[in-house]
Swiss-Prot record:
Disulfide bonds join C182-C264, C669-C713. Residues 393-403, 832-846 have a biased composition (Polar residues). This is Dystroglycan 1. GO terms for cellular component: basement membrane; cytoplasm; cytoskeleton; dystroglycan complex; extracellular region; extracellular space; membrane; nucleoplasm. A motif (Nuclear localization signal) lies at residues 776-782. Residues 736-747 have a biased composition (Basic and acidic residues). The modification Phosphotyrosine is found at Y892.
Length: 895
């Protein structure tokens, strides 16, 4: 009984142990091997349960890492492939946009088929752009549910950036030709095609497609091309040594420059075959393929843009840093010594090489010096320098102490060249004379004059002298420079620049714009190197700077001398070019500018004249406005070379500008070419065309244009259009060599306007005088209307003598009517004479009057008075007067 109970309740010791081991084994077989797996399994079960219960809730979007940041360069194509397999799976939509925005930047284009992001940035797109790439899945309600997202940045660098990202991002094929790489001081030969297009109006895809279509002509990959807009209407490069035309007759848009490299330091003889560009550009095949008119092309050598030296702070507080010296090797180890150093910086043993192994100077090869910004401290040496080992104090003295530093940062190489060992006299510099080209319009390539011989490229001096020992310590900085120099300049005094090649002489012509680029090998400075690193100043003989109103100007930034002389500047002028280095020392080169008379004189076949609004004094007294006017006139004709325009005169009458075109041949008369040029700028009635107005705006406003033939076309009038005049054949006039060409326009005005007007006025005046004399003579002897009216009103009838009847004379009113049968009246009674003396008879007068009647016979016939007008009248309107008074007879007394 006891045994059964005892064996049933308490288990033996080995039984409990066996059960414990069995339970542990079973538990381990079902438990995960790692705690993380259990956690993940639990999270997956929890996520599945939450998704089944809350299917409408958005899930948290995880961030996917895998798209690296990139960089782009202005004018270069950018292309990057998005690794969509890391973001999206089957059935998901990829959306690419600017971070925080709905669309991409204006210069980027996303291609969903190839999953590439490409574009071509302009100067306005510089900076950092953040791009967001997200994957979304179509939800049950039709909306896109974001799944994953990633953000990366693209930094756009300026145009002159040294290493374009497009070369790295494009990932060219293994068999593709690598882009040309020139030496640091070697110019790059670039071919540029000018297009009549506006890049700001293009989409990013159109810009990339333009580069791809150009690949058929250039045989260069798009990422090796450069596409930039035209700045300040500079379509053509004045330094080009080859050029050719396109099919575009005029420029409408702002313009675009598409260029690529041809080689390094090429010239006219070493340029590769460019017929694949020259012929299609001229014939229009390139324009048809690209979709934009081609204005022309040119080839020029471009200087590489070397990184500028960063100004350092001289009095910076030195901070002790650890300097790692280059490894040294020695066959026999000499005894160690200690060289005193300032502030005893801790110098670690050489564990990492940041400079080439130390070797003796090799003739003809430069040495490398690593410098940092900060204070420079010279390390004194004791006795001759010998290779040593590291001493117990931790100071290392190498065989030749080299400048070393351990500050990590950006290494920027720069090259310092040595002056040339030989000097060659440079020939005279002259601007291309505006010669008369041939009438053959098929010429497509324009070559510059023969290349001027220059001195050979500077060769580094051969030296075996060890470089100056220098130990540099600097405060913490983030940049350091690697300077390659043929001759060390540390510690040497500043030397004056040297004149290597003289400018000598510059030729210019009256009324023609000229410009001269000062060559880079004119001066040389040991510290600042070539001329373009020096400061140039143009002065007169008395150390006076050239004024703003001078006819010749100089741009010290671009080192370009330009001007526009007039007839008063004919002759020789002396100027001085001063080159100053950074230390203030200068060198001088004296040269002459020879101004010649107009190349065509009075033989130009046509004279163009435009009337502009404004004050002519503001143009004639400002050389910059005058040059701007010449450039605008050349631009209106489609000529980028301003020397094709010769300014003849600027007169009053608003602004009357007269010029000639040097591209026209003198003989025979180029009537078709002049007509084409005239129609380019003016209508048939003399009104300016819109292209001419736009070319002159906003500085000048055109009012009217006149194109008159001269020289071989002197009998033609082009604008306003007039029928040609027939001129009788006559012997050619003798040319006057000293005639002032500026007076020819005034002579033409007098000949065609003033003299005919004076002749017509004189003829009209003489005709008027003759008509007046004839009128006066015709009116002489006639009464006026007043006189005629007076005579008619106050006059009496006139009876002439031949109108009277002689048989019966009319009775006269002056005699009494006496009948024939009547007897004469009795005589008056006689009175005695004893009358008083003081008394007079009353009829004394009557008795006296009729006294003769008493003496006559009473039987005599009565008195017959003469007719009234027996004699001619003494005057008009006079009336006969009775001289004797008449009185009535006495009363009749019958017998």
């Amino acid at each position: 009984m006891r045994m059964s109970v005892g064996s049933a309740v308490p288990l033996p010791l080995w039984g409990r142990t066996f059960l414990l081991l069995l339970s542990v084994a079973v538990t381990q077989s079902h438990w995960p091997s790692e705690p993380s797996e259990a956690v993940r399994d639990w999270e997956n079960q929890l996520e599945a349960s939450m998704h089944s219960a809350l299917s409408d809730l958005h899930e948290t979007v995880p961030t996917v890492v895998g798209i690296p940041d990139g960089t782009a360069v202005v004018g270069r194509s950018f292309r990057v492939t998005i690794p969509t397999d890391l973001i999206a799976s089957n059935g998901e939509v990829i959306k690419v946009s600017a971070a925080g925005k709905e669309a991409l930047p204006s210069w980027l284009h996303w291609d969903p088929q190839s999953h590439t992001l490409e574009g071509l940035p302009l100067d306005t797109d510089k900076g950092v752009h953040y791009i967001s790439v997200s994957a979304a899945r179509l939800g049950a309600n039709g909306s896109h549910v974001p799944q994953t997202s990633s953000v990366f940045s693209i930094e756009v660098y300026p145009e002159d950036h040294s290493e374009p990202q497009s070369l790295r991002a494009a990932s060219p094929d293994p068999g593709e030709v690598v882009s040309l790489v020139c030496a640091a001081d070697e110019p790059v030969t670039v071919l540029t095609v000018i297009l009549d297009a506006d890049l700001t109006k293009m989409t990013p895809k159109q810009r990339i497609d333009l580069l791809r279509r150009m690949r058929g002509f250039s045989e260069v990959e798009p990422h090796n091309m450069k596409l930039v807009p035209v700045v300040n209407n500079r379509l053509f490069d004045m330094s080009a040594f080859m050029a050719g035309p396109g099919n575009a007759k005029k420029v409408v848009e702002n313009g675009a420059l598409l260029s690529w490299k041809l080689g390094c330091c090429l010239n006219q003889n070493s340029v590769p075959d460019i017929r694949g560009v020259e012929v299609p550009a001229r014939e229009g095949a390139m324009s048809a393929q690209l979709g934009y008119p081609v204005v022309g092309w040119h080839i020029a050598n471009k200087k590489p843009s070397l990184p500028k030296r960063i100004r350092r702070q001289i009095h910076a507080t030195p901070t002790p840093v650890t300097a790692i010296g280059p490894p040294t090797t020695a066959i026999q180890e000499p005894p160690s010594r200690i060289v005193p150093t300032p502030t005893s910086p801790a110098i670690a043993p050489p564990t990492e090489t940041m400079a080439p192994p130390v070797r003796d100077p090799v003739p003809g090869k430069p040495t490398v010096t690593i410098r940092t910004r900060g204070a420079i401290i010279q390390t004194p040496t004791l006795g001759p320098i010998q290779p040593t080992r590291v001493s117990e104090a931790g100071t290392t003295v190498p065989s030749q102490i080299r400048p070393t530093m351990t500050i990590p940062g950006y290494m920027e190489p720069s090259t310092v060249t040595t002056p040339p060992t030989t000097t060659t006299k440079k020939p005279r510099v002259s601007t291309p004379r505006p010669a008369t080209p041939s009438t053959d319009s098929s010429t497509t390539t324009t070559r510059r004059p023969t290349k001027k011989p220059r001195t050979s490229r500077p060769v580094p001096r051969v030296t075996t002298k060890a470089p100056i020992t220098r130990l540099e310590t600097a405060s913490p900085a983030t940049r350091m420079r690697t300077t390659t120099s043929g001759v060390p300049h540390g510690g040497e005094p500043n030397q004056r620049p040297e004149l290597k090649n003289h400018i000598d002489r510059v030729d210019a012509w009256v009324g023609t714009y000229f410009e001269v680029k000062i060559p880079s090998d004119t001066f040389y400075d040991n510290e600042d190197t070539t001329t373009d690193k020096l400061k140039l100043t143009l002065k007169l003989r008395e150390q006076q700077l050239v004024g703003e109103k001078s006819w010749v100007q100089f741009n010290s930034n671009s080192q370009l001398m330009y001007g526009l002389p007039d007839s008063s500047h004919v002759g020789k002028h002396e100027y001085f070019m001063h080159a100053t280095d950074k230390g203030g020392l200068s060198a001088v080169d004296a040269f002459e500018i020879h101004v010649h008379r107009r190349p065509q004189g009075d033989k130009a076949p046509a004279r163009f004249k435009a009337k502009l609004t404004g004050d002519p004094a503001a143009v004639t007294n400002d050389i910059h406005k005058k040059i701007a006017l010449v450039k605008k006139l050349a631009f209106a004709f489609g000529d980028r070379n301003c020397s094709t325009i010769t300014l003849q005169n600027i007169t009053r009458g608003s602004i009357v500008v007269e010029w000639t075109n040097n591209t026209l041949p003198l003989e025979p008369c180029p009537k078709e070419q002049i007509t084409a040029l005239s129609r380019r700028i003016a209508e048939d009635d003399g009104k300016p065309r819109g292209a001419f107005v736009n070319a002159l705006e906003p500085d000048f406003q055109a009012m009217s244009i006149t194109v008159t033939g001269s020289g071989s076309c002197r009998h033609l009038q082009f604008v306003p259009v007039a029928p040609p005049m027939r001129v009788p054949s006559e012997a050619p006039a003798t040319e006057v060599p000293d005639r002032d060409p500026e007076k020819s326009s005034e002579d033409d005005v007098y000949l065609h306007t003033v003299i005919p007007a004076v002749v017509v006025a004189a003829i009209l005046l003489i005709a008027g005088i003759i008509a007046m004399i004839c009128y006066r003579k015709k009116r002489k002897g006639k009464l006026t209307l007043e006189d005629q009216a007076t005579f008619i009103k106050k006059g009496v009838p006139i009876i002439f003598a031949d109108e009277l009847d002689d048989s019966k004379p009319p009775p006269s009113s002056s005699m009494p009517l006496i009948l024939q049968e009547e007897k004469a009246p009795l005589p008056p009674p006689e009175y005695p004479n004893q009358s008083m003396p003081e008394t007079t008879p009353l009829n004394q007068d009557t008795v006296g009057e009729y006294a003769p009647l008493r003496d006559e016979d009473p039987s005599a016939p009565p008195y017959q008075p003469p007719p009234p007008f027996t004699a001619p009248m003494e005057g008009k309107g006079s009336r006969p007067k009775n001289m004797t008074p008449y009185r009535s007879p006495p009363p009749y007394v019958p017998p």
